[in-house]
């Protein structure tokens, strides 16, 4: 089964009685090069443990599982659980966590599942949780890198240079903890259903040391929020 083939996707979803939820920001990839290139950009290999958020029906999940030592995917939509059980049945290094990633203890999750592996995060993120989720992820300092497909406008904000129109508090936060780069853009025609916006993939290696030393990060972020 080709998880990026429109006909195969529709047959799979019909078999499971699945309908897209706009509230959950569900847009499934229908171009095979996109998950392949995202997985490649993540740097996943046999020494890597990958946390994926919102696997959908599993096209990126499969690409990651072919490369990584272990893939743990967190999915909120219970309607997709039997779908993923079918599409990921041939990958013993895959684990599905049923629930809301915003309620997960990321440090505990990494400790439980990725012992001896280099932890990274790679995902096609639902647009509606991008900012709060990435904030939690980078502040947790649990991951060696973060590679995500997100709305292009948000990607540009994350990668913006100081003093530009796109630069803001979220830019500063992401650049304090990581060194983000925009890797490639993904047109809306690569999704089912097609969103109204262009998307982009960013790769964010974690910084070993922050670019500036501060006495109190809590005070830093209070000042940043006041300044922006």
Regions found by a protein language model. Name each.
Residues 1-226:
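Catalytic cores of RNA-modifying enzymes
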């Amino acid at each position: 089964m080709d998880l990026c083939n429109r006909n195969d996707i529709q047959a799979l979803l019909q078999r499971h009685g699945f309908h897209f939820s706009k509230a959950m920001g569900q847009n499934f990839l229908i171009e095979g090069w996109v998950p392949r290139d995202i997985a490649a950009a993540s740097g996943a290999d046999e020494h890597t443990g990958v946390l994926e958020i919102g696997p959908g029906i599993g096209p990126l999940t499969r690409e990651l599982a072919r490369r990584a030592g272990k893939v743990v995917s967190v999915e909120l939509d219970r309607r997709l659980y039997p779908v993923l059980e079918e599409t990921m049945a041939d990958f013993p290094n895959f684990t599905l966590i049923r629930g809301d990633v915003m309620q997960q203890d990321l440090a505990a999750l990494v400790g439980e599942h990725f012992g001896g592996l280099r932890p990274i995060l790679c995902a096609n993120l639902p647009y509606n949780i991008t900012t709060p989720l990435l904030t939690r992820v980078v502040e947790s300092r649990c991951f060696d890198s973060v590679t995500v497909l997100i709305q292009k406008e948000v990607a540009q904000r994350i990668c913006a240079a100081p003093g530009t129109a796109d630069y803001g508090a979220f830019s500063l936060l992401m650049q304090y903890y990581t060194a983000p780069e925009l890797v490639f853009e993904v047109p809306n025609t690569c999704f089912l259903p097609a969103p109204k916006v262009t998307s982009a993939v960013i790769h964010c290696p974690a910084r070993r040391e922050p670019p500036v030393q501060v006495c109190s990060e809590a005070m830093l972020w209070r000042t940043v929020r006041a300044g922006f």
